[in-house]
Amino acid sequence: MNPLKRSLESSSQEHEAGKQKLQKRECQDFTPRRYQLDVYEVAMRRNTIAMLDTGAGKTMIAVMLIKEFGKINRTKNAGKVIIFLAPTVQLVTQQCEVIEIHTDFEVEQYYGAKGVDQWTGPRWQEQISKYQVMVMTPQVFLQALRNAFLILDMVSLMIFDECHHATGNHPYTRIMKEFYHKSEHKPSVFGMTASPVIRKGISSHLDCEGQFCELENLLDAKIYTVSDREEIEFCVPSAKEMCRYYDSKPVCFEDLSEELGVLCSKYDALITELQNKRSDMYKDADDITKESKRRLSKSIAKICYCLDDVGLICASEATKICIERGQEKGWLKEVVDATDQQTDANGSRLFAENSALHMKFFEEALHLIDKRLQQGIDMLLNSESGCVEAAKTGYISPKLYELIQIFHSFSNSRHARCLIFVDRKITARVIDRMIKKIGHLAHFTVSFLTGGRSSVDALTPKMQKDTLDSFRSGKVNLLFTTDVAEEGIHVPECSCVIRFDLPRTTRSYVQSRGRARQEDSQYILMIERGNVKQNDLISAIVRSETSMVKIASSRESGNLSPGFVPNEEINEYHVGTTGAKVTADSSISIVYRYCEKLPQDKCYSPKPTFEFTHHDDGYVCTLALPPSAVLQILVGPKARNMHKAKQLVCLDACKKLHELGALDDHLCLSVEDPVPEIVSKNKGTGIGTTKRKELHGTTRIHAWSGNWVSKKTALKLQSYKMNFVCDQAGQIYSEFVLLIDATLPDEVATLEIDLYLHDKMVKTSVSSCGLLELDAQQMEQAKLFQGLLFNGLFGKLFTRSKVPNAPREFILNKEDTFVWNTASVYLLLPTNPSFDSNVCINWSVIDAAATAVKLMRRIYSENKRELLGIFDSDQNVGDLIHLANKSCKANSLKDMVVLAVHTGKIYTALDITELSGDSAFDGASDKKECKFRTFAEYFKKKYGIVLRHPSQPLLVLKPSHNPHNLLSSKFRDEGNVVENMSNGTPVVNKTSNRVHMPPELLIPLDLPVEILRSFYLFPALMYRIESLTLASQLRSEIGYSDSNISSFLILEAITTLRCSEDFSMERLELLGDSVLKYAVSCHLFLKFPNKDEGQLSSIRCHMICNATLYKLGIERNVQGYVRDAAFDPRRWLAPGQLSIRPSPCECPVKSEVVTDDIHIIDDKAIVLGKACDKGHRWMCSKTIADCVEAIIGAYYAGGGLRAAMAVLKWLGIGAEIEEDLIVQAILSASVQTYLPKDNVFEMLEAKLGYSFSVKGLLVEALTHPSQQELGAKYCYERLEFLGDAVLDILLTRYLFNSHKDTNEGELTDLRSASVNNENFAQVAVKHNFHHFLQHSSGLLLDQITEYVNRLEGSSMDKVELLSDGLPKGPKVLGDIVESIAGAILLDTKLDLDVVWGIFEPLLSPIVTPENLELPPYRELIEWCGKHGYFVGINCRDQGDTVVATLDVQLKEVLLVRQGFSKKRKDAKAHASSLLLKDLEEKGLIIPKNASKTEQFEKHCGSTNPFNNLHVDAMDTQTPKPTKEKNAADSRNISDPLLGKPLHVIVKTSKGGPRIALYELCKKLQWPMPTMESEKVQPSFSSVCSSPGGSSQKATPQAFAFASTITLHIPNADVISLTGDGRADKKSSQDSAALFLLYELQRRGTLQLQEV
């Protein structure tokens, strides 16, 4: 075999390889043929147009050039790129893949669908620096050159694929004429074509030479082809050309064509009559009518064409296609697109009526056609003889019959690959359907391929690609296509090309023939027998090709064409700074694009209008732009024809738009960047979102800071008395005084707060007592008292060295070893009771504690542990009990507070036992084995202590306990195991342990138990005081002096939900959001009177978005004040207290304050809010933005708009409202608007109860943008922008103040239900505002009329109307309500109270929690989530309609419903409403007579053990099921699943089994299992050591919990089993869940993996 001849198999493999995207590839080598090398060498010497046969490898020559030029670019480091241009997207993609495979360059493709038209200069520069080869459509390159994003100086090589397109006004032509021939530094040019002749053919040698020269001159290149064609003819498969002749039509259906014409005229008249019946004469309605008639005419033309060309059956199929398209409302989409309207077709009566007429026409037309067809036509086509009969009767045309015969002649049909070229898209579609009906061709797979986007007969780009891929792979045998597949499409396996419709040009002939790439392939021309015209056409084309090849190969290489001589005058406008330019040719599209960016709605699209004036020697065009444009009227220069006049006036307009700033210096539409500094600094992923996690520090409280505690001199400190009053008689709490070296804010100094203990409440009050002086000795005693009590109760008094076997150290042993933290310094000292503001510190108690500290120092200094028995006596005297430092009577021990010298723990003595040191250590234990015989032996071996009085009785002590969160009533039951018998609900509560201890190890502290009680209140109390002080500190930083802005409001604003307080920032955030929106809207409205609503909205969006608020908050250190973690009393530290739960700082920062670059993390497992010991904590970026809004809301709630504006100023948000701008805006409205002659608005003013001072504001508020077509210079959109913010703040303020006890979630729902366009639309209809709307749109009138009729004729409420799938109200109705609100606000000079007084009755009844209706989809999701069900969702497109299928698997039945709508959201709402009705019918949905929150909380709020699992997931291990529990107590056991078991990973940490079970049920759509937990009596616990090491006889817990789990497997089984008993309810539920998982594993449902 000749090595030059590549097999078709290798060619196919090359193409398939080209389809693979390799991220980092090694370029594939190929061996070029001799003629390819020849062309390559010529192209390296000069600009060349390679004229080679299709399939000859022109692209590979281009690849060789790319390699060489790329190498040069790299060597010279010139930074130049190579541009490869291809005329279609398919070719761009195909060629890009080939270049990627065969080169090592970075290659990218560019076309319009990628959005490159919207790219900016920096984006293009990024592409240039990243890629060396850029493959693109010529229009993309042309536009980038015109915008000066790319310049030819940066291009080293331009490749033109299918360069014969460079004629007329093609982008190839524009690139060369506008840029290349004017450039000083021209890149090299390489063109590729199989036919340089673009016209029908060539008439002579001179004509051919002229067309060659024209192309050469334009591309500045020389045509080159191979003179010796032997190698090409050998290497490139050449299709065998043949003609198939068909007979003339035996039957002409002229009478049927006439009948169809008459029918079309009839319906044309009906459409006209339909329009004449309308009372209005709106232009858009006229446009719809005209377009509808035009479409009707086009449809009948298609049907008649099919009737004449392919026969009666195909005409019937064409009619059916029209009917199907009408059913999908495809024709309506065409009408909408053609008239540049964006109206929802369902929203216009005119659309519906026209649609009905079209459908009736098609049905009648089909009836006329089908009655000519005999019964059983489908059976007729199942045989060859039937097809012959069909041809004779005209059912199929002879031409189509001959095509069928060709198909029938194919051998090895399963591998046949045939392209059939037709002229029209409808032909491809109907023949495709026809062939599928023919039985003896059923072994073929048939499809069609059509291009373009303007027709509904065309395929989308994706469908085109999929169809071509199917044809290439052999899934499709017969592909009917238009000329879209003529050029460049690589199908190496194509064995036959049929020209069902003859080619019209030499280029079409050559290109289509070149698609037949297989060896021995065929190229079949179908010609009517005896048709001289067709024969002459083919003969001329063949002669043209022969002459073209001959002339091209015989031209001498030295015979260069003359240089390019421009034969047209190019009018253009240049921008000197960038080099961008616009030509007269491109100016029209720019003007249209500019108008498209102007404000518009569904019933009005701004467009330019052109008027032409004829003069003797030409035309003058007057351009009128919409009133919202910066330029309205422009008269252009005179031109020779109307088109040129239109171009020139648009060119002048582009120049003016650039001068006025509407076009930027790149002649792109100006996109305003209102806050560029914000945008530039906010670059990053997820700024202001919950996805972004950042590390921030905590702001110190200035009032707490200081080093005064270390001074050895007398001090004067501010004193604040703390008084505690319990609501239970006999419960006494000692008074205390807070001493601090700063003056606390008044609200803190007068604080009153309720602290919630388990079974009681303590009212706490703080009062200022002025300065109090302490001498140096008192300071020392006070510090010892505080250090002893807080460490002895909540911490530890001993530390152990890291040195092995080193003795413990007493932390108060040396003054210099225990340093107080200067960040938080204060003293809490007990006082004697007093009834005035005087403070009388109880120094006797303080001195006693200090004495105990000194005693402990003596005991633990210099290893003098023998001093333990300081007080010694050989005999017990009477009822004396020997303590560590004294003896006392037994009856005085009750409630004595003591300190254990060996553990450093503080206890309260309860009783004397009968046990002694000599008693058996395990005497009260059921434990079989024990290490110690007696208590005395235990203390000797454990602590090295020899009891001096082993015979004296042991004391029963109550140990100190951990502090609790007492700030909220919801925490009062935290940590207890008792049963609340009032409601029968078991509440977890740990029973207090009782400790047995020898008295001689105890030091009495001589302080009453009342003082000890007060100490347990301090963690919660001081946490609240610290928080309020921090909030007050932030208030001071803001600097607005208003006593109404309380610290409590500020505290609420900086507290997140994660804190689990009774309050959070959510409500204030909602209010602040509305306030911010209102303030910024007013500011922008007044400051920019010439900006339209779209521009104002864009600026507002930038100013109030979370990214901006985040940036401003960071600049003001708001993040340091945010409270983002729940109060953990065990980690709270008093001054002088050592932490027993440290959290060492491992953060990537050195200082406490994060001042450098913000650290970001993507770890989803990161714990938010929890601070390390230096105060660093991870926080969501959005939290900071939310806090900013909440602070604004707090100031508005406390001090009104003036206070909120002060916060905005402090933040740096420019939202000032100047009085003179208000006056100017009112004056402008009064000047530019006009009043109707009869004042029709008096009735509206009467409805409003308000008379406008400036009537023009009301006129503007009711003027629709469509009025601008009649000359109006204004519309309601700016006032709508203002009114939107007005109604938002008014309704939010009302809801905030009216529902103070409503939680933040429900408040958000209330606002959403109140502030929305549908609600406002109903208000407009209720008060007949629509009667006063000034507009010029028939479509809008139809929409409003239909909506009003539906609303008035329905008894359903708003939610039912929406959820039933009916369209929402026209947006314009809600808009005018907002614009009226904006007009009144402006007329009253921004008096919100007046506006509310007018609108409150208009908006009534305003939604309340009692009648709040959640959106159906939201309600369904929440209900299912609460009850343990999952919602299956599947959405698909069906024509222009979205079909949403939702299903809910209940325990016994699967509920499935479908919803339909134009939008996915509305379709899901429709389906959800139907499912909710089903659930209600089954009695599962609660009647809607209460708020949603109350319903859910009451009926299913906290019963689901699988809710909030992440809260319970802790690092505690979940035991495996015991062996005796593996057997399940179940009924009807069967394997619920078939197939391979699911792999389930279960974490053994707390919550892990429940999470795994939840994920399993969600995946399988099983209802969540139910849990029932009950008390169980555990075994008696053994005697054990306390954490401090003391011996204790542990009292058994009152009970533990065991949980029973029940799983309903749909249509299969019910499994019920009980887990092991656990100490708390959640752990017992984990045990039950784990048992169930193991049971499912036993059944083969899953395979468990524990981690």
Swiss-Prot record:
Expressed in roots, shoot apical meristem (SAM), leaves, panicles and seeds. Probably involved in the RNA silencing pathway. May cleave double-stranded RNA to produce short 21-24 nucleotides (nt) RNAs which target the selective destruction of complementary RNAs. GO terms for molecular function: ATP binding; helicase activity; metal ion binding; ribonuclease III activity; RNA binding. Pfam families: DEAD (PF00270), Dicer_dimer (PF03368), Helicase_C (PF00271), PAZ (PF02170), Ribonuclease_3 (PF00636). The keyword Heme does not apply. Its cofactor is Mg(2+); Mn(2+). Keywords: ATP-binding, Endonuclease, Helicase, Hydrolase, Magnesium, Manganese, Metal-binding, Nuclease, Nucleotide-binding, Nucleus, Repeat, RNA-binding, RNA-mediated gene silencing. InterPro entries: DEAD/DEAH_box_helicase_dom, Dicer_dimer_sf, Dicer_dimerisation_dom, Helicase_ATP-bd, Helicase_C-like, P-loop_NTPase, PAZ_dom, PAZ_dom_sf. Mg(2+) binds at residues 1280, 1375, 1378. GO terms for cellular component: cytoplasm; nucleus. The gene is DCL3A. Transmembrane segments: none annotated. It is an enzyme of class 3 (hydrolase). ATP binds at residues 52-59. The keyword Metal-binding applies. This is Endoribonuclease Dicer homolog 3a. Residues 1031-1200, 1241-1389 form the RNase III domain. May interact with ARGONAUTE1 or PINHEAD through their common PAZ domains. Residues 879-1006 form the PAZ domain. Its main location: nucleus. Residues 39-214 form the Helicase ATP-binding domain. It is found in: Nucleus. Residues 1413-1481 form the DRBM domain. Belongs to the helicase family. Dicer subfamily. Its EC number is 3.1.26.-. Residues 587-677 form the Dicer dsRNA-binding fold domain. One of its GO terms (biological process) is siRNA processing.
